[in-house]
Amino acid sequence: MAAKENKKILIGPDEGTHLPILDLTHKVTTEHFGGAFTIVEVGLPPGEMIPPHTHTREDECNFMLEGELTFYIGGEIVLASAGAFVLKPRGVYHALCNTGTVPARFLEFHIPGEFENYYDEYEQIVESAMDEDERLKARVELGERYGVIWHEDLIPEAIARFGIGH
């Protein structure tokens, strides 16, 4: 099937909407394939963790571009380096951490693709003048709107499993 003339068929390495605080770039959005999936490119510096959470509406997978990340998925620890795919099915809690010494970059796929606006809204929360309690409440409310459940109770376990001192 030929590409439609009004559809973009090449997205360059420096293209996409970049969210600087999250170091996330929207690459493939819902408008490209009617919401079937989205892809974002994400950077994660050494020592940074994305806390345990569960997606109730979409499956996710990550393709590692650079560096290494440690994933904690449903109680299992997996180390992924460049070239690896990591599958995170909906309904299974997961966290990830850069336990290495160099920045990591990865592509994150969301299937279906209605999740992309979450990142835009989360960026606004992070850059706001809210105190930590207000920010946490806003993150929980945002998660409820997008089907994300944050597991604050699993953070100590994740930190211990990752071997980091947060």
Annotated model-derived regions:
Residues 33, 70, 90-116:
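Ligand-binding loop in jelly-roll beta-barrel domains
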Residues 23-24, 47, 89-92:
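Short acidic (Asp/Glu) patches
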